[in-house]
Amino acid sequence: MNVGVAHSEVNPNTRVMNSRGMWLTYALGVGLLHIVLLSIPFCSVPVAWTLTNIIHNLGMYVFLHAVKGTPFETPDQGRARLLTHWEQLDYGVQFTSSRKFFTISPIILYFLASFYTKYDPTHFILNTASLLSVLIPKMPQLHGVRIFGINKY
């Protein structure tokens, strides 16, 4: 019997995306964002899809690739403070189910936005730039890499 021993992760950031119902909550949140944008009176369907895609990808970039460290006091002696949330996800192991889900979800949203905007050149360029801004940092070759020293500290 282990008295006084906590049964938790060393860094809770590593497993939070694997928790029960997280993927469903994520998908419902994106759907709710789209419904809210569609309810704006002057917002057309193509604009709503493009805004959904851009807001989703901006949020994903900020929360997964720009913010570093953990909101918890972890016993890992500060190893996680220089890592983004994406680099901490699943202890840095590549090609896990969570990483695949968070890589494929902006691609699916991009396909939906492109289809519903009827491949309009302006929307297509905005959606493509938004997609690339979240897919390039997810590449395994860029794990821990800081291009031009951006987000180094």
From Swiss-Prot:
Predominant location: endoplasmic reticulum
Localization of this protein: Endoplasmic reticulum membrane
Intervals, Cytoplasmic compartment: 1-21, 68-100, 141-153
Disrupted-gene phenotype: No overt phenotype; due to the redundancy with other ORMDL proteins. Simultaneous knockdown of ORMDL1 and ORMDL2 do not exhibit any visible phenotype; they remain fertile and show no sign of neurodegeneration. Double knockdown of ORMDL1 and ORMDL3 show elevated brain levels of sphingolipids, compared with single ORMDL3 knockout and wild-type animals. At 8 weeks of age, both male and female ORMDL1/3 double knockout mice weigh significantly less than wild-type mice and exhibit impaired myelination and motor-function abnormalities. The triple knockout ORMDL1, ORMDL2 and ORMDL3 is not viable.
Source taxon at top rank: Eukaryota
Membrane-side (Extracellular) residue stretches: 43-46, 122-123
GO biological process, alphabetically ordered: ceramide metabolic process; motor behavior; myelination; negative regulation of ceramide biosynthetic process; regulation of ceramide biosynthetic process; regulation of sphingolipid biosynthetic process; sphingomyelin biosynthetic process
Gene Ontology terms: cellular component: endoplasmic reticulum membrane
InterPro entries: ORMDL
Keywords: Endoplasmic reticulum, Membrane, Transmembrane, Transmembrane helix
Topology versus the membrane: Multi-pass membrane protein
The keyword Transmembrane helix appears for this protein: yes
TM region positions: 22-42, 47-67, 101-121, 124-140
Family affiliation: Belongs to the ORM family.
Role: Plays an essential role in the homeostatic regulation of sphingolipid de novo biosynthesis by modulating the activity of the serine palmitoyltransferase (SPT) in response to ceramide levels. When complexed to SPT, the binding of ceramides to its N-terminus stabilizes a conformation that block SPT substrate entry, hence preventing SPT catalytic activity. Through this mechanism, maintains ceramide levels at sufficient concentrations for the production of complex sphingolipids, but which prevents the accumulation of ceramides to levels that trigger apoptosis.
Entry note about domains: Ceramides bind to ORMDL3 N-terminus and stabilize it in a conformation that physically restricts the accessibility of the substrates to their binding sites in the serine palmitoyltransferase (SPT) complex, hence inhibiting SPT catalytic activity. In the absence of ceramides, the N-terminus is flexible and permits substrate binding, thus liberating SPT from inhibition.
Subunit structure: Ceramide-sensitive subunit of the serine palmitoyltransferase (SPT) complex, which is also composed of SPTLC1, SPTLC2/3 and SPTSSA/B.
Name of the protein in question: ORM1-like protein 1
Protein's organism: Mus musculus (Mouse)
Gene behind this protein: Ormdl1
